[in-house]
Amino acid sequence: MDKTITFKIDGVDVKGFPGQTIMEAADAAGVYIPRLCYLKDLTPHGSCRVCTIKVDGRAQAACTQPIAEGVEVENNTAELNEKRRDIIDMFFVEGNHFCMFCEKSGNCELQAMAYRLGICAPKYPFQFPDCSLDATHPDLFIDRNRCILCGRCVNASKVIDEKSVFEFVGRGAAKKIAVNADTLAGTNMAVSD
């Protein structure tokens, strides 16, 4: 049987197993760490930074940081929650995220995270970027005004259904999600996939 590893999250002992990340061990122990890009069955990449914690005083992404014996993890602190609010706030002002007009209102992780962190109105000015829409595939439509570039669709499409439907294109401010039309040509891809 594998040796258990004991560490602390906000002063509480948490046990995990070698190879687990702090996020996985926290979930197993019932300790909530905020996240947006993390999905349980996918390799984490820490792109959203909402799960940022402090491990022995150093900022780390909980979804990618492996557990280690005796480390002290800070999660639910005023400083970290303020940074999380800033990140979520920026997601809202950089895109077309007007919850009361959205069909996903009430069933949206971004909206739920904002409420959980106490965000009632953005503190930054809206940017209203003019993001293009992608309707290059007959069964898929990407509204880039709502995309926060978390990468979940890209990773899920590669790992879970192995179709590589979506991909990142561009770099920096020009980075966006695109439908890999060449890969989909002649496939039986359907909206239900």
What are these model-predicted stretches?
Residues 1-4:
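Terminal leader/tail segments of proteins
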Residues 7-69:
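N-terminal cofactor/phosphate-binding cores enriched in small/glycine residues
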Residues 49-193:
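Fe-S ferredoxin-like electron-transfer domains
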